[in-house]
Amino acid sequence: MEDKALLTEAYQLVSKLNQTIQSCKQGLPDDLRLQQNIDEILRALKKAEKVDNAILIELETFYQRTSLLIGLGTLKLNEQTRTAWRNYDKFHYDQVKHVLTLYGPVFGF
């Protein structure tokens, strides 16, 4: 996938998630954390000019934090929001995970 296309698709998917999440906010601390995660990654994607390891790490950080909030948090998501998250999840595994380069010691089990 072309650099700009990856950034554009990530931005569109996170924006869609952001739009759908607005309808099911309840004012809980997890809602605030999720909104902060979304705002951070949207800023980073808007600022990014090319795909490099820095933006891939930002995307991975967003994915890990958001996945934890959705999986174990107190968020009450509707079906539309779950679908938007699954779409981003699929994109992340198909386009980001295999491109991300890890440096330093990596321990596999």
Segments predicted by a language model, with ranges:
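A sequence-composition feature that detects small, non-aromatic residues
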Residues: 5, 9-10, 44, 48, ...
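Amphipathic alpha-helical binding modules
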Residues: 64-109
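Amphipathic alpha-helical interaction modules
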Residues: 21-72
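Short terminal alpha-helical segments
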Residues: 1-40, 100-109
